């Protein structure tokens, strides 16, 4: 149980730390995804709005899409940015139209790629139907080169606003750690308490009948 609590504490520290630059390609390749996940980063560059992909999402705001757009960085790399949530019924052209033109700055949380699709459905690039944020598959489908193997869940975006466009809602990253060890411990305590109560009930009943 202690290791799980230590993990939660480490991730909590990353989420609330000051943002750092996106790690170099060599570091991204050398470090395990779990050691980079939820790292708070700051990136700047120019969006490739025409390459926007909509990925199915279910959030506290309802069902809809994550708005994934590649950001061209100054060092030549491209990183997919989850700009935020748009409601069901949004078309990819409308989502792309919300993309700021010119330089932008994004602060957010680093996330590992979600290869293949969701638990229930596989991505269908040919039909432009996406159920997970698979950075390499999206890059291949949109002709995006030099893409890094992670994406950024945007918390804040600074750029020229697009007049009349309803921008995606950022900052909806869900960080959950199901504490199974604690659940098991509570379950065993509950079972033990129920057993004791049952024994007491039987003992008292025998006394009354005795």
Per-segment meaning from a language model:
Residues 1-210:
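Surface-exposed, charge/polar-rich loops and edge strands
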